[in-house]
């Protein structure tokens, strides 16, 4: 049971103020602070201070005794802490992304290795053989896009821009999965005059269209005025999460985070296929091969939590991680799991007890609890978020 020393990722889209305003994390160099990472990811592992005062990488500590710290089931199934926990602070839209499923990730990783493509190459799609399921939990109002709209909605929204590109007219005549696939690829493939014309038609439509998703297109255009991803809000659900709402992001489903602060939990993977709103490499054939061109109604996208006493559990369809929130009270309650856990103080103050040990977490602080330390007692005020495994 040890407090974590976590790193901040200074990606350009991050907020310069959110982590300071919410959690008092200093920003002396006035850099964008996009993500606070909690976990043992090789790119940027959290650290802990041991009894002798020595600071050590959490990844190295776990590697030295996986079965004890992770639990036998997690150690044998994953061989590492299988999740990464983040506070994500988006001031600007992130790229539209698709994550391949587990089988496609394994095959793509092996294929690119066999082709001799370096892991750090710009054209590399698969950085590891794992899938990347994600859950996002809003701390502030959080704007995102997730999954294709109902086809009837797409048809209606495309009417004002029907003249932007032949693929739009074709989809309106053939509104099915094959037509959507062709439209998606055609918009990404646009170059030169074709792209200029399409974006001009879209921007002209903004003069007469109001509300959503046109407001989201206006927002994105402030940052990406010449990106064909500006058409995406017409195809994808625009989702506004209120604080306390959560959403699971499935494999093979386009999504993008646009603005706001959220907790994000994901499997340990860097496999991302980009699909717009980015200057980075887009492998369009690989992307289209890894997208399910099926509609998901917007009202089905939120993850409905299950309340069990003071715990709010968010059920998800994978075992790479589990996520729950705990309302704290002065009376101690036990938190137990057969895996390691990362506990994060969302608000208030949390006190953790185990044997003679006592650890206090203030907002924005987190702790690592090893599997062999379960259960721990918690008390305090406010809320505690827990990421762990149910195996």
Per-range role (PLM):
Residues 1-209, 279-297, 323:
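Transition-metal
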Residues 38-40, 87-91, 98, 133-141, ...:
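Short, conserved beta-strand element in jelly-roll/cupin
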Residues 48-49, 58-74, 147-148, 226-242, ...:
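A short beta-strand-loop-beta hairpin characteristic of the jelly-roll/cupin
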Residues 88, 236-249, 253-258, 263, ...:
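Short acidic-glycine-tyrosine-enriched beta hairpin
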Residues 92, 349-391:
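Generic C-terminus detector
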Residues 94, 135-144, 260-279, 321, ...:
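A short hydrophobic beta-strand segment most commonly corresponding to one strand
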Residues 261-313:
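C-terminal, non-catalytic macromolecule-binding modules
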Residues 307-310, 319-337:
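Conserved short histidine dyad/triad with adjacent acidic residue
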